[in-house]
Amino acid sequence: NYSSATGAIVDRNGKIDNTSIKKIKGRGNSTWGKAKKPYNITYSDKVSIGGMSKGKKFSLLANYQDDSLTRNRFLYDLADAVGTPYASDSRYVDFYSDGYYWGSYQMTEKIEVGKSALVNDIDDTAYLDADGNVNKNFPFLCEVDSGAVDGEDYYVKCDDGIKVTIKAPELSEGDKGYNEVKNYVREKYNAFHRAAKKADSDLSQYADVDSCAKLWLINELGKNWDSGVSSVYFVYKQDSDGNYKFFGSPVWDYDNALGNATGSAWDLQNFGVKDYTQYSGWWCRFKDRQKRTQNSSNIINNISRNTQVNKAAVNIWFEQFVPAINYFAGKTASYKGSDEFYTKTQYFDLLKDSGAMNYNCLLYTSDAADE
């Protein structure tokens, strides 16, 4: 369910934007059950928040499971810095509702398609031709999501029982092309999935290798607990040569990453990592791997072992990731990859006042703090 609302965006200089809120709705799966709730917000007109590009639809992330409140923003910004397509921009905000302070949140571009949306080169109607018939080929946005639920999500079950939610075009039963779109997405994802399971396959026939390599490296660096399980997005569209392929992006949902997933400690010890907060050791390559056959149905695991991806990843890591990480760590004085990627000290300064108020003014702490 959703509600309309009046709202005010107040910048750091006290300037007020009173653009009305068309819809505000609870979001998230497990996160909705937490004390600090996340939301999706749709404004009646385009707004800019903290210098972000103007848009109508935003996700208000609670980051309740992350005591630092910053893992999502750091990895989103890193993804943007290394050239991952459709990296979501975001800002730290203080959220009030009905006069009550709810905490420090991360206001981020919502994963949507459309001319003014995050995925701005496809839209919900691209699957239909001029006569209203389903095209032979068409772009779509999908998410690998093990938590997809019948009756709530528009999804298909693919090889190995993998659930793939169709985010765009997002259709309801009875809509034109409802079943045709499901069959098309299943066919294309299965072909990609089967190719990814073979380390020596020509994955470039099915996917954009560079974006898949970056998606893997973001998850690998972050030791993302949900890697390949949920919130794994792919955009299926034409490349520069006109061939339809899967692009690994947008990146999403990293509050249980960078040493924050208590549940990963046992797994990491099996991989030779004694302390799950360490950055050393492989993660994605072992995630969901079957002990007897060493095979995996986890898409990020399979991508990480593909020969083409590994070859591309070497250059991407040293030419794009390493300069960004060195700048973040304060090892280099400047960085040309992005104007919105910062040093660890700068990230702290961006968040410190809002973060301090989050914990000083509220009675709840995160699950991680409770444990």
Task: Name these PLM-found stretches.
Residues 65-84:
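A conserved alpha-helical element in kinase catalytic cores
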Residues 40-42, 59-62, 94, 103-107, ...:
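Structural recognition of the beta-strand scaffold that forms the well-ordered cores
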Residues 34, 166-229, 237-238, 243-251, ...:
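Middle-to-C-terminal accessory/interaction subdomains
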Residues 47-48, 62, 83-88, 100-217, ...:
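Internal "kinase-insert"/substrate-recognition segments embedded within catalytic cores
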